[in-house]
Every structure is written in structure tokens, then in C-alpha cells.
Design a protein with these regions (language model features):
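Sec/Tat-exported extracytoplasmic proteins
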Residues: 61-65, 111-115, 134, 158-167
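Short acidic low-complexity segments
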Residues: 66-76
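C-terminal/domain-edge helix-coil "capping" segments
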Residues: 138-169
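Short coil/turn motifs at beta-sheet boundaries
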Residues: 35-37, 71-73, 96-102
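A structural "domain/chain start" motif
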Residues: 2-7, 20-58, 64, 167-169
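Sec-dependent N-terminal signal peptides
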Residues: 7-14
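Solvent-exposed, acidic/flexible segments
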Residues: 50, 54, 100-104, 144-156
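Surface-exposed short loop/turn segments
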Residues: 79-123, 129-145
Length: 169
């Protein structure tokens, strides 16, 4: 029994060392974040300062090591436009009801350092599809809510990656 425990522990230790050695990192982990954001002083200005996307971006900036400041102290200014959410039917059932829906979440962003536009005004967007089950209204509503939350996080991650890339160039 002790030998089996030792083998199991050795196997787990070997696999974790192998994954670490090959450079594997979880997506979005703090250790895997872009080092160019660490210590950057950023002012976040949003057309919708209290919405979920602004909160998600602020949270991810902090996790990446950025410091959110007032305009006087910030060296970078990140501007977010209004969030736009659209639904589009991809396919219909025989009863002319929506069978598959495409969801698009987007916003306009820009990043400036003094008078230099690091990211000129551009659109960031994420697109998802989901199957619309007309028989399961409660489940569909919950799935849509979870999908929107996931889209907020994905869009915020995309914006953070763009910021990191612009700071490295």
C-alpha cells in the first residue's frame, strides 16, 4: 500500500514537472499575464462606468499588475465606448421560430499615452452561438445569462491582450 502511494505521488510530481518544464500556463493566470502591464499607471474612462464590462476590464487590469489611477497620476488612458449587444437568428425551426442564435458583444476602445495613440479608436468584439430551445424557457434564459458573463470576461481578456501588445511595440 505504501508502495502504491509512493508511485502515485511520484507520477503526479513527474507530470507536474513535465508540464512546468514545457512552459504550460493556464489561460488568464497571473503568472501568464503580460509583464508589460505590471506597474503601469492606467486611467480607465468608460461611457458606461458601472456596467459589467468596465468592471471586468478593471479587475483584469489589476490582476495583470496595472495600477488604476486618477487622470493626474495616470500615464496611460484607456477609453471604452458603450457596450453593444446584438442577437441574430442563424436558423429557424419548421414553425419559423429561432433554432440557433448568434450573440455579438462589442465596444470601441482606445489607449493613449500623453498625445500618442497606442491603440487608435477601434472595435473589440466577441461572437458566440447557442441553440435556442423553445421548450425550455428557464434553461434558455439561464444559458443566455451565463453566456453573457463569459462574453464579458472574454472581451475584457481580448482588450487586455491588445493593451499588452501595444505596450510591447
Amino acid at each position: 500500500m505504501l508502495a502504491n502511494l509512493f508511485r502515485s505521488a511520484s507520477a503526479i510530481l513527474f507530470l507536474s514537472a513535465l508540464l512546468t518544464g514545457c512552459g504550460f500556463q493556464l489561460k488568464g493566470s497571473a503568472q501568464g499575464s503580460d509583464p508589460s502591464l505590471i506597474g503601469q499607471s492606467i486611467r480607465l474612462i468608460s461611457d458606461e462606468p458601472r456596467n459589467e464590462l468596465t468592471a471586468a476590464i478593471g479587475q483584469q487590469l489589476k490582476l495583470a499588475g496595472a495600477i488604476l489611477n486618477e487622470p493626474e497620476a495616470a500615464t496611460l488612458v484607456l477609453r471604452l465606448g458603450a457596450e453593444q449587444f446584438q442577437q441574430r437568428n442563424l436558423s429557424l425551426t419548421a414553425q419559423a421560430r429561432s433554432a440557433e442564435v448568434e450573440l455579438t458583444m462589442s465596444t470601441h476602445i482606445s489607449l493613449n499615452r500623453a498625445d500618442d495613440a497606442l491603440i487608435p479608436k477601434s472595435e473589440a468584439s466577441v461572437v458566440r452561438q447557442f441553440l435556442n430551445d423553445p421548450q425550455n424557457v428557464v434553461g434558455k434564459t439561464e444559458e443566455l445569462r451565463l453566456l453573457r458573463e463569459e462574453m464579458y470576461v472574454d472581451l475584457a481578456s481580448q482588450i487586455i491582450r491588445r493593451i499588452g501588445h501595444s505596450l510591447n511595440n
